[in-house]
Amino acid sequence: MSLLPVMVIFGLSFPPVFFELLVPLALFFLLRRLLQPTGIYDFVWHPALFNTALYCCLFYLISCLFV
């Protein structure tokens, strides 16, 4: 249960989890952009699965901070 209120922007109601999804998405794009030049994706068996797991881990960490 989040303590953040429901946000209303231009008459559209957004639940708190919407913003909890946007913050890790921004961090994911930044982290992915930093990891690509390091060559870590050469050691990853399935890059799409790695990206999904990375986003899920970031979402979990951010949602723990918001609670």
UniProtKB/Swiss-Prot annotation:
Disulphide-bridged cysteine pairs: none
Coiled coil (residue ranges): none
Tagged with keyword tRNA-binding: no
InterPro entries (UniProt xref): DUF1656
Pfam families attached to this UniProt entry: DUF1656 (PF07869)
Primary localisation category: membrane
Membrane topology: Multi-pass membrane protein
Source taxon at top rank: Bacteria
Protein family per UniProt: Belongs to the AaeX family.
Protein name as annotated: Protein AaeX
Protein's gene: aaeX
